[in-house]
Amino acid sequence: MSHLNIANLGEDFVAQWLQSTGWIILHRQFSCRWGEIDIIAQHTRNNQESILAFVEVKTRSPGNWDDGGRGAITLKKQAKIERTAKIFLAKYPDKAEYICRFDVAIVAYQGISQQDHAAIGEYKFQLQEYIPAAFDCLIY
């Protein structure tokens, strides 16, 4: 399976997890000329203010070289995500007053054997870490 397909499956896994914890998925793979945001999700707590999360998903196999994907969230990558988030908010001005944050989801995957009845498909995914407000950007 290609790297792109694995990444998409990791994003599917995180989107399902977010939905199971009360988040609404607004967009998947939102892109513009500046970059792409894997998942944009909204959550409202007890009829209070809504939170908008711009989620970067990093899906890695065991023994990877970049600390489970954490090493790939460089300052340059953060700036691209911030610019893309600004484009999203300009396109959807009704969301501009929401509390915004930038989250990172670290997902591990591994191939499964024929005897592993708990997994579906060729791979087993596990959310290693979900980091809310993993980095700060200034959105106006």
From Swiss-Prot:
Gene Ontology MF annotations: nucleic acid binding
Gene3D superfamilies xref list: 3.40.1350.10
Stored InterPro entries: Restrct_endonuc-II-like, tRNA_endonuc-like_dom_sf, UPF0102_YraN-like
Family statement drawn from the similarity comment of this UniProt entry: Belongs to the UPF0102 family.
Name of protein: UPF0102 protein alr1796
SUPFAM superfamilies, per the entry: Restriction endonuclease-like
Organism of this sequence: Nostoc sp. (strain PCC 7120 / SAG 25.82 / UTEX 2576)
Pfam families given in the database record: UPF0102
